[in-house]
């Protein structure tokens, strides 16, 4: 994935798949986009567009609670939309994640988007294990194809939010680490998203 700045408010992203779905995701956040070629998309009328890792460089190691809550709601809206059309991502890939206007996060790894069949998705493409936000079910997996519950994605989202709010390096016991935000909305959401049984996981937008 490459980003090319065309003008002050216009960007081109190259090396994409399923750009029709991507345009729908951008529309959730009132971001205007169009494409002339199948593997690229042009995003117009935005202040900034950058890769997630570049955005991270301008942040403190952790973000504040309200920012973390907004980040969760951002991804939850995307996740629920994808489920509505019968699809779900297997995981978040931080190397293929863009940030629009410094606070809108849009996954570009739609090659990792799968059709939900009987509440399951079958992952039939290789994925990198060098990813701190890999879904719990994929961390120890070594076989392709691999079938998981579509809510497997929720653990990937939870790990991203946990890392930006608390820090994955601070505690490998997620439930212990969450105690610093005990009683908050994110405490319960992240706890449910990190349940061992994927079918019991839950995301809620308020």
Where are these regions (language model features)?
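Conserved C-terminal C-lobe helix
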Residues: 181-196
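Conserved end of the kinase activation segment
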Residues: 138-150
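ATP-binding glycine-rich loop module of kinase domains
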Residues: 1-41
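Activation segment signature within eukaryotic-like protein kinase domains
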Residues: 71-72
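Protein kinase catalytic-loop region centered on the HRD/HxD motif
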Residues: 75-88
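A conserved short helix/loop substructure at the end of the activation segment
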Residues: 194-205
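Conserved structural core of kinase catalytic domains
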Residues: 25-66
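Activation segment/activation loop of eukaryotic-type protein kinase catalytic domains
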Residues: 91-133
């Amino acid at each position: 994935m490459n980003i090319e700045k065309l003008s002050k408010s216009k960007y081109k992203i190259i090396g994409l798949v399923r750009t029709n779905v991507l345009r729908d995701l951008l529309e959730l956040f009132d971001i205007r986009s169009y494409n002339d070629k199948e593997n690229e998309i042009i995003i117009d009328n935005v202040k900034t567009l950058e890769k997630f890792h570049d955005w991270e460089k301008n942040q403190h190691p952790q973000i504040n609670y309200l920012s973390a809550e907004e980040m969760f709601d951002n991804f939850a809206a995307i996740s629920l939309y994808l489920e509505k059309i019968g699809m779900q991502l297997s995981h978040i890939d931080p190397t293929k994640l863009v940030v629009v206007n410094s606070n809108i996060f849009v996954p570009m790894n739609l090659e990792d988007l799968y059709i939900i069949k009987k509440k399951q998705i079958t992952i039939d493409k290789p994925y990198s294990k060098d990813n701190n936000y890999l879904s719990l079910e994929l961390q120890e997996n070594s076989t392709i194809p691999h079938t998981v519950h579509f809510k497997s994605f929720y653990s990937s989202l939870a790990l991203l939010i946990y890392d930006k709010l608390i820090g994955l390096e601070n505690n490998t016991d997620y439930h212990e680490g969450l105690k610093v935000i005990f009683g908050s909305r994110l405490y319960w959401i992240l706890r449910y998203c990190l349940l061992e049984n994927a079918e019991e996981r839950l995301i809620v937008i308020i």
